């Protein structure tokens, strides 16, 4: 027997969800965009980036991990939450060394696309200019630590055929970094190495090959702003 749809609202708009769906998944099915950086389709969500934070009954929660409940009233696109998301995006920029004009991922970078969507100009926080390494992680992958946002998408989604994790977190808090096992990274096929690069939302994981192969104007976010594929689906 099919379970009845769950009825809830997002910013006052009546929505329906399938049982077991998260707020993010249900919002997407209803044509409502909730920004996120750490979520990747097919992987278990971690809620680590907090950009998808929404408010329900005065409580803040990650939309990518919180299941929808009957009668839930979700606040999403409201001024204070949007400003908080913008602040988080700014923090990602100032805590790393993101030189967008010279980055191979420019135009395909989700962090850059979010900065454009939220019209980020000058961050409200001082740049930290941390000293970080560029690591030749084996024969197929380059790890650019200056751009890493610790979203853990690579940790969750890049594994060898015998299910060993190629990437893993080291240390905690502001000293946290993503470690790459060079031996396991070298064992990846060309296709697997390319998928590892694609799963990174920024330009931190790069496959060793010719850079800047896709010209300006044909890159992913040159064509349409991030989130538009969800919002246009409902029009």
Regions found by a protein language model. Name each.
Residues 12, 38-41, 143, 185:
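A structural connector/turn signal
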Residues 50-51, 59-235:
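Fe-S ferredoxin-like electron-transfer domains
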Residues 11, 19, 46, 172, ...:
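Short glycine-rich loop/turn motifs that provide flexible caps or phosphate-binding loops at active sites
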Residues 15-70:
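N-terminal cofactor/phosphate-binding cores enriched in small/glycine residues
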Residues 2-11:
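Eukaryote-biased recognition of intrinsically disordered, low-complexity regulatory segments
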């Amino acid at each position: 027997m099919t379970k009845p749809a769950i009825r809830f609202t997002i910013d006052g708009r009546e929505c329906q969800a399938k049982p077991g769906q998260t707020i993010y998944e249900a919002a997407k099915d209803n044509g409502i965009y909730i920004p996120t950086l750490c979520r990747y389709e097919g992987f278990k969500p971690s809620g680590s980036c907090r950009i998808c934070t929404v408010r329900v009954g005065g409580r803040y929660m990650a939309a990518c991990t919180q299941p929808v409940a009957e009668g839930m009233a979700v606040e999403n696109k409201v001024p204070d939450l949007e400003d908080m998301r913008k602040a988080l995006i700014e923090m990602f920029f100032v805590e790393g060394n993101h030189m967008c004009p010279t980055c191979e991922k420019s135009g395909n970078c989700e962090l850059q696309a979010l900065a454009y969507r939220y019209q980020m100009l000058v961050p409200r926080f001082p740049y930290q200019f941390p000293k970080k390494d560029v690591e030749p992680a084996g024969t197929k992958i380059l790890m650019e630590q200056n751009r890493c946002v610790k979203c853990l998408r690579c940790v969750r989604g890049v594994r060898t055929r015998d299910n060993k994790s190629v990437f893993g977190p080291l240390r905690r808090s502001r000293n946290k970094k993503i470690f790459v096992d060079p031996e396991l990274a070298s064992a990846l096929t060309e296709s697997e190495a390319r998928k590892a690069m694609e799963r990174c939302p920024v330009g931190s994981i790069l496959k060793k090959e010719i850079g800047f192969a896709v010209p300006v104007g044909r890159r992913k976010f040159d064509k349409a702003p991030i989130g538009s594929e969800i919002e246009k689906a409902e029009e």
